[in-house]
Each structure stands twice: as structure tokens, then as C-alpha cells.
Amino acid sequence: MMTSKINYYIDLKRFDYKKCLDIQYRLVSMRKNDLIGNTIIFVEHDPVYTIGRKADPRNYSNVNVIRTDRGGDITYHGPGQLVSYFIFDVRINGKKEVKTFLNNIENVYINLLKNLGYSASTGDEPGIWIEKNGKLKKVASIGMAIDDYVSYHGVALNINKEVLNGFIKINPCGLPPAVMDYIDIKRDDAIDLIIREIEKIYGKFNKIEYEGLIS
């Protein structure tokens, strides 16, 4: 949906998962009421395991989890991972186009990875995959939700080897932990590349502090 509101992105740096979820809910309400434009939250969480609506307990028998309303199964968030939450109006000409929106987000990450020299694609399983040492490896997990016509939750991109330790205790999205991998990129560089790709689809995004957005 076209809006006169300015698109923004927020960088919360290192931030608690539950507190960030509360921020998402607040921004979703604001987006539904057209008080803000499309908004992205960038964040790195303290170590945490979260489960989505399709979670299978057999995939996380040895860890404490936070239950969420996103799609998907269990995943891990922690240092070495850049999480992007997309608070977007998914309507096109007044019609809710969830599939188009999801394809757009997937293509942002596929193009980002291709620009870094990786052969990237979606696969039979959710997420973004690259070919590494002759094997397909998952470097980004996707889990979204839609409230009426506004998206929330998002994409977790592994950007440092440190994050892989968090997947050892679970079957992420029902898969063996060995499928998870990472790309070696600085956090700020990854944000810049995501913004560059998203602006090709949704127009200009300006950086803002969270307090400035809700004031």
C-alpha cells in the first residue's frame, strides 16, 4: 500500500528478545493506524531459543524456549547473528499480497549474498541457502507473522561463526544442526546491504532512534 509516511529503520544493537517483541507489537499497531511508514528493526539478541506456531517438541527437548506467534519451528538467536524485523504493510492496491511480500524479502537476502559472491537461493526447506564446499548450507532463517495486513517478525542472518554454537542443542526448523552456517561479514556492512536491496523495492529508508519514532 502506498503511504505518505516515511520509511525508517532502527538499530537496537544488543537487545533482549522479549523487550524487542513488545516493541514490534507497538510498531505493528502504529503501522496499522498509518502513524508510521514501513519500518525495519535491526537487532542482535542475547542467547535465546524461540519456537513458532508449527513447533515440534522433539526438536528442542534439551532447552528452554520462548513461544511466539511467528511461523516455523524452533530457532536460535544470539551473538553473531543479525536479526531484521519487518513491520510492513503487505497490501498492493488495497489487496493483501503476503506471498509477494515474502518473495521480496527472500530476494533481498538472495541478492545480498550474490553480491558477496555466494550462490544463494531458497530451497525445499524455509530460509536462505548457499553452496559452501560443495554442500548446501542455511545461513538465514525466516519466520514471519501477519496481523491483518501488517507483517512482523523476520529474518535472522548468521554473520559470525560464534552463532553456530547455539544451534548444536536443537534441530533448527526440524533440520540437523550441521546444515547451519554463516557468512563472514561485519554487522554494519550487512545492514547497509540489506537497506540497499530493500530500497530497490520499497523506496528510501531513513535511520532513526526508537524513541524518535514513537514520539
Curated annotation (Swiss-Prot):
Query: Catalyzes what?
Result: octanoyl-[ACP] + L-lysyl-[protein] = N(6)-octanoyl-L-lysyl-[protein] + holo-[ACP] + H(+)
The lineage's top-level taxon is: Archaea
Q: Which UniProt keywords apply?
A: Acyltransferase, Cytoplasm, Transferase
Annotated BPL/LPL catalytic domain residues: 34-215
Provide the E.C. number(s) assigned to this enzyme: 2.3.1.181
**Gene Ontology, cellular component aspect:** cytoplasm
User: Its GO biological process terms?
Assistant: protein modification process
Compartments in which it is found: Cytoplasm
Q: Which HAMAP family match?
A: LipB
Share any extra remarks.
In the reaction, the free carboxyl group of octanoic acid is attached via an amide linkage to the epsilon-amino group of a specific lysine residue of lipoyl domains of lipoate-dependent enzymes.
Name recorded for this polypeptide: Probable octanoyltransferase 1
Q: What lineage does the source organism belong to?
A: Archaea, Methanobacteriati, Thermoplasmatota, Thermoplasmata, Thermoplasmatales
